[in-house]
Amino acid sequence: MYDEKICRYTLNRIFGYRPKIAHALVESIGSASEVFRIGSTRLKEMLPYTKGICLLSDREYEKSYIELKRLEAAGIRFICNDDAFFPALLKECEDHPMGLYVRSESPFREIFTECTNIAVIGTRDISPYGREWCERIVSSLPGTSPETAVISGLAIGTDITAHRTALKKGVRTIAVIPTGIDGIYPYRH
């Protein structure tokens, strides 16, 4: 018997940059665990030209099980796209990931359902004028109702200015890290 969460995690690992393939498999077969129950040989017959199908194996499933345990030991959770806490607006995107990696001091319901999230994006080469305005805008957020969280990517420039200002002002922050949760770049952030 295959665990649905581990199967979705494995699909995310294999088809991370091509999530539409993972979604199509789950939608056409019924569930991520059913994709693994059928097995890669049968899937190759059904979808002969789909890259990555050969990786849908018990070996990859076991590798995912071990990785998930390692992440959980480090305080990192994988929230599947069928979880109640998966961001609803993200789920509306047809190419949303099969899940998100989350390390948080706050409960998930607070992060994804009880906060108004404001994305702050911009240049890595921020000017003094841009930095001043980013700080002003983020500084105006405390006390807003409902509570607000700043979402950005922890990159140099605008992103880190928004995060640092938010933390100084007691505003929650959410970092969307493209490099993976166990390796933040740049390291100093």
What are these regions (language model features)?
Residues 1-85:
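Short, small/acidic-rich helices and loops at N termini and domain boundaries
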Residues 1-2, 80-189:
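Glycine-biased, small-residue-rich flexible motifs in mid-sequence functional cores and linkers
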